[in-house]
Amino acid sequence: MKPDEIKALSADEAKQKLVELKAAYFNLRFRHETGQLDNTSMLEKTKKDIARVKTVLSAYNR
């Protein structure tokens, strides 16, 4: 996701997106460990998206 897309989310939408991204990251890690993941850069991209959403959520909590 692009940072502008994440900033446009409401607090509830951002929390839901965080749950979805964490589940996706778990699945990617599992597939990587079993040798089924071809595009390993998806791990890094998903991890960075999680960090972006967490940053936006912390801004809502201030």
From Swiss-Prot:
Disulfide pairings: none
The UniProt entry, under Gene3D superfamilies, shows: 1.10.287.310
Q: Does the keyword Ribosomal protein apply?
A: yes
Cellular component GO terms held in the UniProt record: cytosolic large ribosomal subunit
InterPro entries (alphabetical): Ribosomal_protein_uL29, Ribosomal_uL29, Ribosomal_uL29_sf
Alphabetized, the UniProt keywords read: Ribonucleoprotein, Ribosomal protein
What CDD domains does the entry give?
Ribosomal_L29_HIP (cd00427)
Q: Which family does it belong to?
A: Belongs to the universal ribosomal protein uL29 family.
Report the protein name in the record.
Large ribosomal subunit protein uL29
Q: What is the native source organism of this protein?
A: Desulfosudis oleivorans (strain DSM 6200 / JCM 39069 / Hxd3)
